[in-house]
Amino acid sequence: MHRTFYEYLMTLRNPNDHSEIAEFAKNAFLDQSFPKQEKDYHRLSDYLELNGNYLPSMAVFDETYRAYEASESTGGDSYQ
């Protein structure tokens, strides 16, 4: 994996999209403490469990992280 999860997440920001994942991306952008250099699922999950009160459910993170892993394994931006 070359880019960080945060870098991937920022590709999902869209002010016209009100999906849970787009909202997650927007709120992570506003979260000045978000671990921007992190790639590890468990470290990110631990951070969000303690600080991600903007996430309606950890399932949103899980879905986004799976898409991140898929995009990194194919070398592109894939989100379904």
Curated annotation (Swiss-Prot):
Per its UniProt record, what Gene3D superfamilies does this chain match? Answer: YozE SAM-like
Listed InterPro entries: UPF0346, YozE_SAM-like, YozE_SAM-like_sf
For this protein, the record's Pfam families field holds:
YozE_SAM_like (PF06855)
Question: SUPFAM superfamilies, alphabetically?
Answer: YozE-like (SSF140652)
- Top-rank taxon, per record: Bacteria
Q: Which HAMAP family match?
A: UPF0346
Q: Which NCBIfam families match?
A: PRK13672.1 (NF010193)
* Name of the protein in its database record: UPF0346 protein LSEI_1394
